[in-house]
Amino acid sequence: MLQPMWVLSDSDLATIHSATVELLKSTGIQFLSEESIELFRHHGFRVEGETVFFTEEDIDSALKLCPPSFTIHARNPERSVEIGGRRPIFSPIYGAPYVVDFEGNIRSGTLEDYQTLVRLAHQLPNQDMVGYLLCDPGDVPAGKAHVHMLHASMTCSDKPFMGSSTHGSRGVEDCMRMGEIFFDSSRAYLREHPFCISLINSLTPLRYEKGSCEALMAFARDRQPLLIASRVTGGATGPITMAGVLVLQNAEILAGIVLAQLVSPGTPVVYGCASGIMDMRSIVVSLGAPEFSKILRAGVQLGHHYGLPCRGGGSLTESCDIDAQAGFESMSTMLNAMAYGADFIQHSAGCLSSYLAASFSKLVMDDGICSYGKAMREKVDFSEEALAIDIIKEVGHGGEYLTHLHTAMNCRSAVWQPAYSYRGGLNAWEASGKPDIREAIRERGKQLLAEYVQPDLEPRIRERLEAFVLAYKA
């Protein structure tokens, strides 16, 4: 594995941390939850109304309790993932209200669309997880959408998934109860074997809303890992300067981490870098901008400075179609996240139009970008076989390697192969009708769905999950 490419000096890190401490100490963070406020007050924090103030000692004490890595357990143990380990973990798009299907039709998401996205994520070889809220299934009641999405994650894939942090403490309890059914286990077992990681977003600037506080505290009590994130938009919800964005983001994330550790010391957390800037002409969040990658790079370095695994994103773009813009922006943001050492890459595949749309084709395309990035991160093999000194001597001056046994024995493993990119040359491409990569991606996706086989799940567990969803009262 290649070492991360750092951008901040030790002096820069100290400056950001010092400014963050000053902000938390003098201005504080609002928690719009009486339960959270009472917990802070119980532990001796300075509280004024809904605003909590933090000292550097409060921050340091919480950070010391956070594990540097942890495992998310899948029902199929071979699918379990370590976050904070030696490689990034990929989880697809999150939170899209719209869907773009293989034919290019744009519509509000449905439960069937959601299930299709989960099946695609299950089939794609580089997606480690199947996420949560891949699209908003608008054809089911909002109050029970989370149980339908969890049911899809549990029954359409055997990869690990994310938890339901969108419905406050009730959504957490539903997630845990479904987890007990799915793993055929007790709550105590799940606390020792975490099965989901859940996104907790601050309400920037300098706030956590009630539902997020409830979900954070409930998941922490059950020892489920938390992805505590801040999504500052420079020029809109935060300063337009990169340094200002980093300070505001850092303050919000650290405050959430402190709350998690007060609830349950040792709760696994991920430092969630999700901030960017607004294009002031279009008033659109600019995910493909170089500023987004610079903020991500610095944020990941800062999180690692604190000893925490870090989130980065992903295959991101403002483009509304599978076009050149989508390709170069998604490749840039993904490879930057991987080069900077992000441990958990959310929105790793499927994003169009600045988080607004989950695209079936984009999910397939971006999985190829994930594969490309993984190949770039691999160290060069300097084994005796790879050095091939004897082969070079044998072939000698002016020889060729195309027909040599060494080439035949190693050609499949030594060179990365794309799943859908064209490599046939100009004349062959013209002779074959000038095939379009977008069509190749669509056909690849349709093939994956045609080959999909639902993972085995004991009938009694499947029946209990279905009964839970059917009986659920929104």
Question: Model-predicted segments: where are they?
Answer:
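N-terminal glycine-rich anion-binding loops that anchor highly charged ligand groups
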Residues: 11-16, 28-43, 48-50, 88-91, ...
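Glycine-rich, N-terminal phosphate-binding loop and its surrounding beta-alpha-beta segment
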Residues: 38-105
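Glycine-rich phosphate-binding active-site loops on the catalytic face of alpha/beta enzymes
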Residues: 335-357
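Flexible, glycine/charged-enriched surface loops at secondary-structure junctions
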Residues: 30-37, 48-50, 128, 189-192, ...
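Catalytic-core signal marking the mid-to-C-terminal active-site face
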Residues: 4-19, 27, 32-41, 361-474
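Short beta-alpha connecting loops at secondary-structure transitions
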Residues: 2-5, 282-287, 315-320, 350-362
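Helix-rich catalytic cores of soluble enzyme domains
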Residues: 109-339, 343
